[in-house]
Amino acid sequence: MVAFFLPGPRRDPRIRRTARQGMGFLVQHLLIMGSSRILKRNQEMAMNKCSVLLNRAREFEPSRANGGYILSTSSYPQIRQYAASPDEHLRSLPSLLPPPPGQELPLAYLRAQRQSSGNYRGIQAQRRPLIDQTGALQSSFPESICLKEELQSLSMPRNSPNAGRNLVGHPHSSSKSSSKPCHFHFFRGYCKKGVNCQFFHGSVPELHNPRQVHPFASLSKLDMEIRELLIGIPPPVAVDRLPSMYFEKYGKPLRPDGWLTESQQHGRTGCSLTSLLMGLNTIRVVEREHGQYHVVLVEDARKKYMDCLGLAHSCNLMDTGTGSNQIYMTFPVHSKFTDDDVENYFKQFGPVSGVRIPYQEKRMFGFVSFLYTETVRLILSKGTAHFICGLRVLVKRYMEKSELRMTWLKSVSGSQVDSCLKVTIGHTIAKAPSKKKKEVKEQCSKDQGPIKIYRKNKQFDYREHRTSGFGVTNEHYIGNNMKKKSHRSDDLDEASAYEDSDEIILPDSLGLY
């Protein structure tokens, strides 16, 4: 039988070339998918091996298995060998003590180098020489993704302070990582951006550099470093800027021992950064407008900031009034301490220039003078009660008579006074409350002398009135000018009464101040 094949339409060679190219793309896609599946399978196998090894290690040393030291210091073939080895072999491994408090891992001078290769090679077991603090070589570990994820998921819980770090203790940061410290992390204790924050979240233990790890044994060195930092900078410097400036100058964060952020103080021992700065000797914390805290040097604070700024060098930020370098103290009658005891007690707040306790049979008060006004402010910020030689001593700021007058004028000024009476002291006129007017009446009635306080719509009397305590002279009041008459006899004080303005000039002896 003969078969005849009819010639069909001729195929275009371009179609054959396109089909050949499509097959090539399909093969490449299958190869990529196969390699990704192989990579995923290898990672799952590696994670399973790590899980098996960790679970077996937990049975022997539960408290030391979470550190992941075996995983971090062993290569992947060693991990597979450990996972398949019997229990006797695991028990024969050297028992490792937990790392000291200053270190999270016993690794120093280690730098994580990530591989930025475009192809997929699976798990790469590259070895890195590790040197501990004693100079001895340690084994290396592979920088595989599975080990990091295994340590993060199994060994380090989320609430652990080491969570979110890789094996060498560095935080997982993006390519935009900066050396500037994060404001929220340093002052609030947390950052809402977490590991994606572009600023520095590090603390002292995670730097792993002896030149950067600097726990402050005392505040003296911190005081000296901050003083050197502030010298040459125009004052004042905001407290918020201080951590970043400190890190730029010294290359280490401002995190001394015992320091906690504001959010970490509840139920824990420590102090805030502002309270820490208040404990230093060569700098002062001042409060400016809008409640902002700034730091200045002591000499700058004495020159220009002590009078115009509120001194915040105390936790309760008490306002102690105007500047005065003396305090007035009262104490029990049976007190037996001497002037030297008083001086030695107040020397802890600042230099003392003198102590004066009047000699009396029953002494109950005294005066202490200081070289600087801020010393008085600091003493009063601690409270009014102090104990010298076991005896309770009450202190308050010493005020001159002129200051007492101005204080009383400020206290009676405003809307809480009665406008029916005015008291004139020198060239200052201030409104006095009706209570003071009542005291004037009682004082005059005790002396049993005539007194007239003239009211409006009454006949004006030009006669002079006398009392046993003081003399009263009538005067005219015309516009804004006051025409004053003075009368003085037998060393008596003087006072004047006015019909139109109801103004009375009262003597100092009435105790209005």
From Swiss-Prot:
Annotated spans, Disordered: 155-180
Cysteine disulfide partners in this protein: none
Entry superkingdom: Eukaryota
InterPro entries reported in the protein's UniProt record: Nucleotide-bd_a/b_plait_sf, OST-HTH/LOTUS_dom, RBD_domain_sf, RRM_dom, Znf_CCCH
Bias type Low complexity, positions: 170-180
Keywords: DNA-binding, Metal-binding, RNA-binding, Zinc, Zinc-finger
SMART domains linked to this entry: RRM
Keyword presence, RNA-binding: yes
Annotated ranges, domain HTH OST-type: 218-299
Zinc fingers (C3H1-type) by residue: 176-204
Family annotation (PANTHER family): RNA-BINDING (RRM/RBD/RNP MOTIFS), ZINC FINGER CCCH DOMAIN-CONTAINING PROTEIN 18
Protein name stated in the entry: Putative zinc finger CCCH domain-containing protein 51
Native organism: Oryza sativa subsp. japonica
